């Protein structure tokens, strides 16, 4: 019979093989995700109620530490170095306090964001190099900025007797940030998926010509998604339009979006582009409560023709075995803008209320899906 020490050695040997058995570039990403959830369950079973509570209570400081490291430039310095660096080396490069760097490095090492190769010597790993990317820095700092709304959420819900109809102007964000402005008045930074490969655009655009309106990116920000479609379908295949509020579109240059039309538009107003092949919403509806989402959807439906498709690209929650990220995202939406991360059934119900029906769902990475809706057939 194995001793506890032997069990630990066997467990350690299995863990050391994890990155080989389930690499980040594995062909079937779902296999790696399943393995990750099994590993998380194993960690949970090793926790006592006390250690679980401790990990949960102190978790925000992991994010804050990563945010400080991003702003200081620690990840950048380590990623550029071909040799391990000490806190003094890093502090010298950044012209900052070595004692502070040492404290941050301990936190990063404890949370596997850097590797301590020998005592006091640190090297970059895959996580370190990922934190150099602008979208990852933006994601971290966005979450740091959202923290006031998370902290205010319990008291805000209590003050409203847990009976609320939130929206972006009346939610925990205003309380936590001590402001009357919405969170969305802050700059946004997101990573865009190459969603073109997940949806059959070629079939939808098969008979298009230069005058057809192929793709309307509603609330499309700086047009990254529209450019992905444009890159796959040249101007000769039809027109592509990005719509957003003036304070967003005035940041776009024609050079950054060649052969893409830019249009000022508020989703609450009637949709001016009629009969497009595809109307596209990425990460839009989750920012809004049901009654506001229905208002927007009704405007889209009124502009659609029988051949039009409305594509809703959102992270969808599952009622059975939801991922941690999706449940965190849901509360984040509630706290910051009164929105919701909906399930497939909840999103379908919204569409049906405005005369649309779901005609297909395509899965994309990280819990996200593209839901296609068309006008209900009589």
From Swiss-Prot:
Summary of the protein's practical applications: Griseofulvin is a spirocyclic fungal natural product used in treatment of fungal dermatophytes.
- From the Swiss-Prot or TrEMBL record, give the protein name: O-methyltransferase gsfD
Result of knocking out the encoding gene: Impairs the production of griseofulvin, but accumulates the intermediates desmethyl-dechlorogriseofulvin, desmethyl- dehydrogriseofulvin A and desmethyl-griseofulvin.
The record's EC number reads: 2.1.1.-
**What is the recorded function of this protein according to its Swiss-Prot or TrEMBL entry?**
O-methyltransferase; part of the gene cluster that mediates the biosynthesis of griseofulvin, an important antifungal drug that has been in use for a long time for treating dermatophyte infections. The first step of the pathway is the formation of the heptaketide backbone by gsfA which is initiated by priming with acetyl-CoA, followed by sequential condensations of 6 malonyl-CoA units. The resulting benzophenone can undergo a spontaneous dehydration to form norlichexanthone.
Gene Ontology molecular-function annotations: O-methyltransferase activity; protein dimerization activity
**Residues that bind S-adenosyl-L-methionine:** 219-220, 244, 266-267, 282
- Please list the GO biological process terms of this entry: griseofulvin biosynthetic process; methylation; terpenoid biosynthetic process
Q: Which InterPro entries match?
A: COMT-like (IPR016461), O_MeTrfase_dom (IPR001077), Plant_O-MeTrfase_dimerisation (IPR012967), SAM-dependent_MTases_sf (IPR029063), WH-like_DNA-bd_sf (IPR036388), WH_DNA-bd_sf (IPR036390)
Q: What keywords are annotated for this sequence in UniProt?
A: Methyltransferase, S-adenosyl-L-methionine, Transferase
Question: Catalytic activity annotated for this protein?
Answer: desmethyl-dehydrogriseofulvin + S-adenosyl-L-methionine = dehydrogriseofulvin + S-adenosyl-L-homocysteine + H(+)
| Signal peptide span | none
Q: Which residues form the active site?
A: 286 (proton acceptor)
The UniProt similarity line reads:
Belongs to the class I-like SAM-binding methyltransferase superfamily. Cation-independent O-methyltransferase family.
Q: In which pathway does it act?
A: Secondary metabolite biosynthesis; terpenoid biosynthesis
């Amino acid at each position: 019979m194995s001793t506890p020490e032997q069990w630990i050695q066997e467990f350690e040997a299995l863990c050391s093989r994890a990155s080989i058995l389930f690499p980040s570039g594995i062909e079937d990403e779902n296999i790696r995700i399943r393995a990750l959830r099994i590993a998380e369950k194993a960690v949970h079973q090793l926790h006592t109620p006390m250690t679980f509570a401790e990990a949960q209570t102190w978790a925000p400081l992991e994010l804050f530490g990563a945010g400080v490291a991003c702003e200081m430039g620690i990840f950048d310095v380590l990623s550029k170095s071909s040799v391990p660096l000490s806190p003094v080396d890093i502090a010298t490069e950044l012209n900052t306090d070595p004692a502070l760097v040492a404290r941050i490095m301990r936190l990063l090492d404890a949370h596997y964001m850097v590797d301590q190769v020998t005592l006091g010597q640190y090297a970059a790993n895959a996580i370190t190099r990922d934190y150099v990317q602008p979208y990852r820095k933006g994601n971290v700092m966005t979450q740091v900025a959202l923290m006031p709304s998370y902290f205010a959420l319990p008291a805000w819900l209590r003050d409203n007797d847990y009976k609320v109809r939130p929206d972006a102007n009346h939610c925990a964000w205003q309380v936590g940030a001590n402001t009357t402005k919405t969170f969305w008045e802050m700059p946004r930074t997101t990573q865009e998926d190459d969603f073109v490969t997940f949806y059959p655009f070629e079939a939808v655009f098969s008979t298009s010509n230069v005058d057809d309106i192929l793709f309307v990116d509603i609330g499309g920000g700086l047009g990254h998604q529209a450019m992905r479609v444009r890159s796959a379908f040249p101007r000769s295949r039809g027109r592509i339009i990005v719509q957003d509020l003036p304070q967003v579109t005035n940041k776009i240059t024609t050079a950054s979006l060649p052969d893409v039309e830019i249009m000022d538009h508020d989703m609450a107003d009637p949709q001016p582009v009629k009969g497009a092949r595809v109307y596209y919403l990425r990460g839009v509806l989750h920012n809004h409560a049901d009654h506001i989402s229905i208002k927007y959807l009704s405007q889209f439906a009124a502009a659609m023709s029988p051949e039009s498709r409305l594509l809703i690209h959102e992270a969808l929650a599952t009622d059975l075995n939801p991922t941690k990220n999706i449940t965190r995202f849901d509360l984040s939406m509630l706290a910051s803008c009164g929105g919701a991360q909906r399930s497939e059934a909840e999103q379908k119900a919204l569409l049906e209320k405005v005369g649309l029906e779901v005609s297909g769902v395509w899965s994309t990475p990280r819990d996200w899906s593209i839901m296609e809706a068309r006008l209900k057939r009589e």
